[in-house]
A protein has these predicted regions:
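Bacterial N-terminal signal peptides that target proteins for export
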Residues: 1-9
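C-terminal motif of bacterial Sec signal peptides marking the signal peptidase cleavage site
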Residues: 17-20
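Low-complexity, acidic/polar, glycine-enriched regions of mature
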Residues: 22-155
Length: 155
């Protein structure tokens, strides 16, 4: 089963990343909610990370880019066909761009990963923060809500 909420998660993920570039203004405080807990009746499923890909899109005034990122691990808890809880660990080193080629592709990926010397903090700084995490806090009207942790900051 493919989860639509992974697309929603990535949109939130890219939004957080897009605004993390050297912003000196005070960061907005977003309340962190308790992660959903599965009931005793729920069945835990492990995400097939080889078959799972998160698609991302990032935009700026001069254009946009899109690509993929992989999961390191993940679990989903179902009870009578309904998702009750879930947690996903995202492999930040796996972020790739799919709309550029050659040097431009390599430069953008290095910029996003934070592997450019002197610009490690611009986006994801994968050397210091190799993973991100999404924990579900609930589902309302088929929209998954959750806490996204990137670079040890949870929103």
């Amino acid at each position: 089963m493919k989860f639509t909420f992974l697309k929603l998660t990535m949109m939130a993920f890219i939004t957080v990343g897009a605004f993390s570039c050297k912003n000196t203004e005070k960061e907005a405080e977003t309340p962190v909610e308790e992660a959903s807990e599965a009931t005793e009746m729920a069945t835990e499923y492990t995400v097939d990370t080889d078959a799972s890909t998160i698609m991302w899109e990032g935009a700026k005034p001069t254009g946009k880019h899109h690509g993929t990122i992989k999961l390191s691990s993940g679990t989903v808890h179902l009870n009578n066909g309904n998702v009750e809880a879930g947690e996903f660990v995202i492999d930040m080193n796996s972020i790739t761009d799919e709309d550029l080629e050659g040097d431009d592709k390599a430069k953008l990926e290095a910029h996003l990963k934070g592997t450019v010397e002197g610009k490690e903090g611009d986006f994801f700084n994968v050397k210091e923060y190799p993973t991100a995490k999404f924990e579900m806090t609930g589902i309302e009207n088929n929209v998954v809500k959750g806490n996204l942790t990137i670079k040890d900051k949870t929103n």
